[in-house]
């Protein structure tokens, strides 16, 4: 991707040299409007689509330069990829889950900074985890108790810190299957302790 400008501005074209790596090789779609693009230490919000290789954006965080790069990220939530089907708070993090493209993926915000979804390796950084399973387990609900209980179409899972009583961080998340009953879209109700 190459931005026409590196500064915070509106109406800036961002051009891709090819559709490779954009929406599974389909390039930019009209449903990408509103989606965030991040690269070169900056961020831009897509405001319109010109064609499969050009989008018009509002740069919200300045890019370090206007050099072309193949290292970029498109925001996970959009009309193209789907929006989260459930949301919860867990250990001072806002957690989204269950998009159309990533039905068994959990998106955790930065601890105490609910709008910051920038992943990293620091203990308080945002993180993204996908439930590993032999089948697609679309997430139906999440319930925060001592652990984050995640109900999916194929079973129930818990998300917690790796064998400790510590808070979850990008380096210690454990996701364990608890049962194989499967869940509906009805929210869980805690019973007992």
What positions do the PLM features span?
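Beta-propeller and closely related beta-pinwheel folds
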Residues: 73-93, 98-193
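Autoprocessing Asn-cyclization modules and mimics
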Residues: 1-71
């Amino acid at each position: 991707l190459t931005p026409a400008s590196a500064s915070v501005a509106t109406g800036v074209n961002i051009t891709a040299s090819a559709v490779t790596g954009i929406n599974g090789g389909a390039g930019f779609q009209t449903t990408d409007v509103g989606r965030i693009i991040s690269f070169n230490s900056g961020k831009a919000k897509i405001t319109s689509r010109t064609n499969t290789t050009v989008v018009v954006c509002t740069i919200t965080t300045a890019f370090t330069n206007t050099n072309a790069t193949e290292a970029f990220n498109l925001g996970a939530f959009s009309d193209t990829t789907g929006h989260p089907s459930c949301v919860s708070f867990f250990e001072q993090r806002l957690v989204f889950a269950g998009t159309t493209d990533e039905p068994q993926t959990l998106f955790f915000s930065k601890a105490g900074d609910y709008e910051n979804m920038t992943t990293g390796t620091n203990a308080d950084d945002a993180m993204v985890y996908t439930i590993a399973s032999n089948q697609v387990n679309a997430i139906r609900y999440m319930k925060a108790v001592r652990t984050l209980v995640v109900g999916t179409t194929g079973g129930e899972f818990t998300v917690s810190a790796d064998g400790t009583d510590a808070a979850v961080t990008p380096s210690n998340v454990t996701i364990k299957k608890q049962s194989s009953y499967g869940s509906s879209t009805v929210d869980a109700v805690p019973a007992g302790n």
